[in-house]
């Protein structure tokens, strides 16, 4: 990984950019960027989502009466389920995986040193179910090692990897593998997670996130060439592609982001399959949500730092839009911080050579932002209602989530990017016990 001197320089750079803009031009220009960057990205996501829907997605068969997918040459599919302390969820997860309408599957559950009753539950199920194989690791090694173990044991070239608390839709495995059968350069396919936990405000807000933000982002990124990350909770991989890049890294806090960049930097492509539904549990407390998003943001910063030099090779030009998007979003977060600090110093009466009269959006900007949130909701509802019909019940929370999304992104980026740049180090990434929600919706 890039040494500490370089990473410290990067941190100084993202702080100096907004300061230089404010000092040499004006604080007002700096704050315009704070408003217009989320505005611009939201428009990009809306346009990209609509384009993906019109020219691809709307033609794909879907619905209760749709026939089961028929895959070319009837390949076998290995569903790998890494488990750590999943006694409350793993049985339901395995039954959903085995209930696929596509029959040529095997399920491999990897118990990563669980300390609860997960081992006993898996052994009992394996004795009763022929298509289920169970592997026990003596000690907790982390999700990346569990996935590697499952991949080594799998019989198929096509691996569908899900979490130990995720419920696959009846055709998810077939849908998510299909793009790899028709394009030999597709190394991975990411699915479409849907939220089960929605009994609290935090849970309902995340329904809005996955309905109005995440899906549009994935569709847009797929249109302009590359995807920032596969979904860690449901993704399919071509085993030969994984072998070429060395499988998952065990020293990265988010193995899903890391493997996505490793594949794409080796000229493999990643596809988004919205019909590969997977029902998941998510945090329903603010503390749980914060810890999860901080981990995601830290993982993105680690991958950014790890791959920064490789990105500039000419063969990786398709990754440049992701690089610039991540860089500008990070600069946006630190611009917000600098703006708040300058404004607070001015309020305290300290003389500065920088003029900043306000940090809140103007009346016109506020109207534009509200209009854009509403437009983003309408577009998302039109697209996602195909897969989840009760989204209107979360109408209020979905409309306002774009604002919450950017505020959460601001806070987690500031903390995680600073942490990674000041303390770049390699160590084994192991499981933590996440907030899985209070009640399951």
Curated annotation (Swiss-Prot):
One of its GO terms (cellular component) is plasma membrane. Probable N-acetylglucosaminyltransferase that catalyzes the polymerization of single monomer units of UDP-N-acetylglucosamine to produce the linear homomer poly-beta-1,6-N-acetyl-D-glucosamine (PGA), a biofilm adhesin polysaccharide. Gene3D superfamilies: Spore Coat Polysaccharide Biosynthesis Protein SpsA, Chain A. It comes from Escherichia coli O157:H7. Residues 1-4, 54-330, 384-394 are periplasmic. This is Poly-beta-1,6-N-acetyl-D-glucosamine synthase. One of its GO terms (biological process) is cell adhesion involved in biofilm formation. It comes from the Bacteria. The keyword S-adenosyl-L-methionine does not apply. Keywords: Cell inner membrane, Cell membrane, Glycosyltransferase, Membrane, Transferase, Transmembrane, Transmembrane helix. It is found in: Cell inner membrane.
